[in-house]
From Swiss-Prot:
Chief place of localization: membrane
Signal peptide positions (record): none
Family, as annotated: Belongs to the UPF0161 family.
Gene Ontology annotations for the cellular component aspect, listed alphabetically: plasma membrane
Organism taxonomic ancestry: Bacteria, Bacillati, Cyanobacteriota, Cyanophyceae, Oscillatoriophycideae
Organism: Picosynechococcus sp. (strain ATCC 27264 / PCC 7002 / PR-6) (Agmenellum quadruplicatum)
UniProt protein name: Putative membrane protein insertion efficiency factor
InterPro entries assigned to the protein according to its UniProt record, in alphabetical order: Membr_insert_effic_factor_YidD (IPR002696)
Length: 80
């Protein structure tokens, strides 16, 4: 499942994204963020982080530097 999600994101970046002008308000781009989030946290948590990020990518949000977190909030609850 993870490889299918990653393949889909890479396919979007290669074949669909170039058809449109650059419009992502964030650095790294939303698709790069999604790749990193799924690779780091797996399909469920990574996809959730990517969807939350996509929800913030609109003209009324200032954007800027927004990297994938090193730990998920759930991971912080389990630290000793």
């Amino acid at each position: 499942m993870k490889s299918l999600i990653l393949w889909s994101i890479k396919g979007y970046r290669r074949w669909i994204s170039p058809l449109f002008p650059p419009s992502c308000r964030f650095q790294p781009t939303c698709s790069q963020y999604a790749l990193e989030a799924v690779e780091r946290f797996g399909v469920l948590r990574g996809s959730w982080l990517a969807l939350k990020r996509l929800g913030r990518c609109h003209p009324f949000h200032p954007g800027g530097y927004d990297p994938v977190p090193h730990l998920c909030h759930h991971d912080l609850d389990n630290t000793p």
